[in-house]
Every structure is written in structure tokens, then in C-alpha cells.
């Protein structure tokens, strides 16, 4: 748990290529890499978590990277990768980060970091960063941040930087999600996500099922996302709002407009606090959403504001308000 044991290398963090600390396990340009077995990789993150929250008390605007800490597993520029049957726990920072990879299978993993009594900050279970053809199957995830986060770059010129990129052809299926901030999250450093499927999953105590972080300083397109066959309980079913943390337009003068379109949610049976937590904004446009065969109980936000989404289609949507 001593950061001085981790070398500073050229790596990828928070939507930018830079010098930062290596992960505990680092894989770069290794096609066919496999990590498997019934063992456990324990990041021993408690000391880092305590230090992070102490720093945040003294310097409230400190960034996630200001508290120097390593990730658990980082795989980059590698194809035909498989990680299976491993327990990845107590990461100091992001747990599993894949960058610029093609054909990745993450199978039957158990990924955990605590939300109590010490919150493990920024311990995303799986960060998919400018990748394609990724399968996440049969995994259990419970972390004090997002479970599946789709990343790819941030900033007003992010879509013109060759180090960045979109995520496409991603399947997450047959997984169980415990506590997490978002089951499937687009952002916050993300530019283009398309052909994304989340299906046949169970939720228990997650904060959000689908979270679209609309960053006003980054051009973003989230399209062709399918969420289907979901059961359990969640605080918010669909959550869309501007994400302004560390907002920086740099030298760009025009207002960026982002887009989320062709989003389908179907065959979903959930108990939640809020169903439709969608904020209207001039900085993004929402269109071609489809809600199909939904059975929801919710404490609030049971009314779907059809003025927020262009070309919204609803079929067999049952939302019952409960106290």
C-alpha cells in the first residue's frame, strides 16, 4: 500500500494519455493475454481510501488523480484477451481498465470494493476505454463507483485526438450488480458509444441502471444502446443530466451539443425510487428512445416527460407509484 513501489510510466487515465503510476498488473501489446483461475487479486486499498477522503476534507476541489494511487489491472493495445474466474477486490483506484483493445472477454469475475464503513473512491469495476468487441458475462460487481463505465476521452477537441476513441460492439450479460453508482454508465470522459447491449442482469441496491453523463465541454454521441431483461431493485432507472465536474472548454468558443439516440429499454421489472430522472438541457439532444414492456414501481418521477425526448415510443409501460 505504498505508492512509491509503483513506477511512473506513460499510461492512460481519465480520458488522457499521460505519465502516472502503473497498475498492479500491467499488460501492453500482448495479444492473446489470459488471466484465469480461482484466485484473488487484492489491491489492499484501505490506506489509499482513507488518505483520499482526508485530502478531500482539506482540499475539497482536489481531483481523483491528486491522491496518488494505482489501478488494479490495466490492459492496453491488446487483442484476443480473456480474464476469467478471478476475484478482483479492494482496488485503490479503478479495478479493471482496458484501453484500445479488440476482442476482450471478461468472464465470471467477482469484483468488489466497499461502500461501507470506508467508501472506496473511484473504484470502477470495469472501465472500457476506446475498445471494440467486448463481452462481459457472468460477473458479480459491487463497487463504490460505476460498475461498467464506457470511456474514451474528454475535452472540447476530444473527438479529434487519435489517442481517444469510441466504444462499439459491447455486450454485458448474465451479470449481478450489487451497490454501485451506475450499472451501465456512458462517461464521464466519453465521446462515442454505439452498439451497446446490457441484458439478462439482476440488480440489488445499485444507484442507477442506465446513466448518461452529458459533459458540456466534450462532443458526445451515445447511440444504439439496448437495455433488456433486467430485474431487481435500483434507486434510479434511467438518469440523464449534465456532468460538469472539472468543466473546461479551454480555447473553444462555440457551445458544444451532444446527442443520445436510439436508446431502447425493454422487458424490465424493477422496484426503484425514481424511474425517469432526465434533465432537459440546451447542451444535448435526446431522440428515438423506446420503452417497451416495463413493469416499474417507483416512489417519484413516475411521469415521463415526452417533451424532453424527440420521437419517444412507449409500449406496455406500467409505472406504479408507491409510498
Report the location of each language-model feature:
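Extracellular/periplasmic carbohydrate-active domains that bind, remodel
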Residues: 1-323
